[in-house]
Every structure is written in structure tokens, then in C-alpha cells.
């Protein structure tokens, strides 16, 4: 997050790579507030979620920014989530109909990709 003319600016450095945590951090950084908790938001949307999501200040090559730290409890053994497990988590979520439709489409693409390599 850069400050330009006293307001936050979201800068995405595509050449450095882009992932969901980076996008989440950028958007959450725009709304940064002591009254806003990413963990609480995640648990509100996905009640079964036991992960902690934290916005953390970061510096890369002298440029200040933010990143997301996502801490998930490690299950015992080698665990896989099936499409049915993910669908159940989505069913338990409080996502809007539009967000749910997008999430389902993303998971279907990922499931097909996983199936093609196994």
C-alpha cells in the first residue's frame, strides 16, 4: 500500500507474482481499521473455518506494503479434501448467491485440474 496525496493506493506488482493472499491483503489494506478483523470475517462467511487470517505490514526492496498471514491448524496424517468436503463447506457458508456461484465455478475448475493429474 502506497500513500500518494494522503490516500491509500493499491499497487499490484504482477511481475513479482500474484496469489489470493496478495489480492486479499491489498483489498483488506484499503479498508484497514482496528474495528475490522479478517479472521472474524472469514469465520462469519465460513463458520466451520478454524484458520486465523491476519493483515501484516511488509517491506520488499524498500517498498512498504501489506501481506496476509493465514494460519491453519495442521490435521494429523496426510489429509485430502474431496469435492464433497468443499461443497459441504460452501453449503455451510454465508456467501451471497453471486459469490457462491463464482466460488463453485472456481472449485469445479480446480477439481477438473486435480483429476487430470491424478
Give the positions of each predicted feature:
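Short, hydrophobic/aliphatic alpha-helical segments
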Residues: 1-11, 109-118
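N-terminal phosphate-binding or glycine-rich loops at protein starts, especially the Walker A/P-loop
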Residues: 2-52
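Glycine-rich nucleotide/cofactor/substrate-binding loop typically near the N-terminus or early
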Residues: 30-118
Amino acid at each position: 500500500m502506497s500513500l500518494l496525496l494522503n490516500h491509500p493506493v493499491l499497487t499490484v506488482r504482477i511481475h513479482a507474482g500474484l496469489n489470493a493472499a496478495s489480492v486479499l491483503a491489498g483489498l483488506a489494506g484499503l479498508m484497514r481499521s482496528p474495528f475490522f478483523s479478517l479472521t472474524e470475517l472469514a469465520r462469519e462467511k465460513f463458520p466451520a473455518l478454524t484458520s486465523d487470517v491476519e493483515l501484516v505490514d511488509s517491506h520488499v526492496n524498500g517498498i512498504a506494503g501489506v501481506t496476509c498471514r493465514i494460519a491453519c491448524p495442521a490435521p494429523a496424517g496426510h489429509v485430502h479434501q474431496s469435492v464433497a468436503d468443499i461443497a459441504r463447506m460452501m453449503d455451510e457458508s454465508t456467501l451471497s448467491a453471486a459469490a457462491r456461484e463464482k466460488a463453485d465455478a472456481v472449485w469445479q475448475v480446480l477439481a477438473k485440474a486435480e483429476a487430470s493429474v491424478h
